[in-house]
């Protein structure tokens, strides 16, 4: 299986608790538009393998295309990019590479601000069997929030 052993994250980022159940990625310093935030590597796995992973681990699998996903290499090596939460008005966006996802700042980001991305483009793929895992109520607070996020 193709594998990228390490993920990168900007030294300007850290993982913090968002509430009693969730964590998110936050800026520890100001970030300029266009700065690379994270490069998330891992293992490329077929859909059938995703369904065999522990339920809590499946949420870290990114759909790539044609029934393949990028999964973290292990539970102990989950990069910060896998922890970005959804927002309908994100401040980060991803550039998909062969074996990695690169998140960049879509605008200037203030110190202390949570780094978010929009999950909806990833839901527009060709893999309808994975879609039930990607259904949730968005509470981002954006005035044009999509509400229920689903493929």
Descriptions of predicted regions:
Residues 2-93:
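Catalytic cores of histone-lysine modification enzymes
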Residues 88-151:
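C-terminal SET catalytic tail plus cysteine-rich post-SET Zn-binding segment of SAM-dependent SET-domain
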């Amino acid at each position: 299986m193709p594998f990228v052993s390490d993920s990168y994250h900007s030294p300007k980022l850290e993982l913090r608790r968002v509430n009693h159940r969730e964590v998110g990625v936050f800026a520890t310093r100001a970030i300029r538009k266009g700065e690379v935030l994270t490069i998330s590597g891992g293992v490329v796995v077929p859909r059938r393998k995703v369904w065999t992973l522990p339920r809590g681990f499946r949420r870290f699998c990114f759909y790539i295309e044609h029934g393949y996903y990028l999964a973290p290499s292990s539970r102990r090596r989950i990069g910060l990019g896998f922890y970005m939460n959804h927002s309908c008005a994100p401040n980060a966006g991803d550039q998909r590479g062969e074996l990695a996802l690169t998140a960049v700042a879509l605008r200037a980001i203030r110190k202390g601000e949570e780094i978010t991305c929009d999950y909806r483009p990833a839901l527009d793929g060709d893999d309808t069997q994975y879609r039930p895992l990607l259904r949730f109520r968005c509470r981002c607070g954006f005035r044009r929030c999509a509400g229920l996020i689903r493929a």
